[in-house]
Amino acid sequence: MSDREEKLAAAKQRLLEVKKKKRQAKSKNSVAEDNVDRESNDGNNQVNEPTGNDNTQVVENTEDISASNVVSAEGAEASTGDASTQSPETSENVVKNSVDESVAEKPEKEDLAVIESEDKAAKPDGEIKKNVETEVTSRSTSSQEKDELEKQVKTLHDLNEQKDKKIKELKERINDLTYDYETLKANADDSEGKQTLVSKREAALEEFQSKLLIRENEINKRELKMNGKEDDLKKREKDLENRLLKVEEHEKSLNERATKLSEANENFNNRFKEFEEREKSAIKQNKEQSSEGSKTANQTHEQKELINSLEKKVSDIALEKQLLEEAVERYKLAMVEFAECQRRLKELEAMHFEQPGSVTEKLFPDPTNFEVIDNVSIDLTLTGFPGAHGIPFSV
C-alpha cells in the first residue's frame, strides 16, 4: 500500500471517529431529555395528588427538576462542546492533511449535512427550556426559587448562545478550509496536468533525440561507405593512370619498332634493287661471253666466283627475309596485344563512368589517334639469276 492510500485511510478513520463522538453526544442528550420528561411526569403526578405538605413537596420536586435540568444541560453542553470542539479540529486536521498531501478527497456534502444535523441535535432543545420554565413558574411557590431558576435558565440561554456562536465560527472555519482545500486541489490538479504535459514533451524530446542519433549513425555509416567507395575509385583511377602510362610506353616502343622495321624494309628494298642491277649486268655479260664463243679458264673461274658470290648474297638476303618475317610476326602480335589493352582500357573507363559520383568527362585523352597497320605486304621474288629461289610472302 502506498503512502497516499495510507494517509487517505487514516483521514477516513478520523472522520468516522468524529461521527461516532457526535452520535454519542446525541445519545447523551436524548437520555437527559428522557430523564427530564420522566421527572416532569412524576412531578405532575405528585401535584395532582394533594397532600398535607404540597408546598414543600412541590418545591423539592421543582428543585430536583431544576437540578436535573441543569446537570443534563451542562452534560449536554459539555458533550456537545467536546464534540463540536473535536469535530472542527478533526475536520481541520483532515483538510490540512488532505491539502498537504494533495491526495485526499474532499468530504462529501452528505457528511457535512450529517455533521450539521448532529450539531443541531446536540444543542439543548428550546422546547425543553420552555417546559422547564413553565413547570418552574407553575410549581414554584417561592419567589427566591423562581429567581434562581430564572438565573439558571438565563445561564443556559447564555451558554447556548455562546455555543451557537462557537458552532457558527467553526462552520465558517470549515467553509474557509474547504474553499482553501478546493483551491489547492485545483492548483494541484493544474500542476499535475502541467507536469504530465512536461513529461510527455520530455518523452517526445527523448524519442526525437534517439531518432536523430539513429539518423546520425546512418549518415556516418553512409559517409564511411562513400569514403570507402571514393578511396576505391581513387585506387582505380591511379591504376588506370599506371596502365595508361604502360600503354603509352608500349605504344612508344611499338612505334620505335615500326620505325626500325620501316628502315629495315627500306634498306632491304635498296639492297634488292642493287642486287637486281648486278643480276642484270651479270646476265648481260653472260650473253656477251656466250656470243663470243669459247671462254678462257680465267673467265670461267671468274664466272663461277661471281655465281658463288651471288648465291651467297641470295642466301644472305633469304636469311634477312626470314628475320624480317619474324619481325613482322612479332609486330602483328604486338598490335593484337595493343588492341586488347585498348579494349580493356575502354572497359575500365566505362566502369569508372558508371560509378555514382564519377565525372562525366573522360579523365584521360584517347591515345589511339593513329591508324593500326592491318596488312603488311612484302614481295621478295628472287628469280632473276641461276640458282636463285623465289620465296614470295605477305603479311
UniProtKB/Swiss-Prot annotation:
Keywords: Coiled coil, Cytoplasm
Sequence ranges of Basic and acidic residues compositional bias: 103-133, 144-155, 276-290
Region of interest called Disordered, as start-end residue ranges on this chain: 17-155, 276-304
Organism classification: Eukaryota, Fungi, Dikarya, Ascomycota, Taphrinomycotina
Record localization: Cytoplasm
Biased composition (Low complexity): 134-143
Source species, domain of life: Eukaryota
Protein's UniProt name: Uncharacterized protein C713.09
GO CC entries: cytoplasm; cytosol
Polar residues bias locations: 42-71, 81-96, 291-300
Coiled-coil intervals: 224-351
Disulphide bridges, residue numbers: none
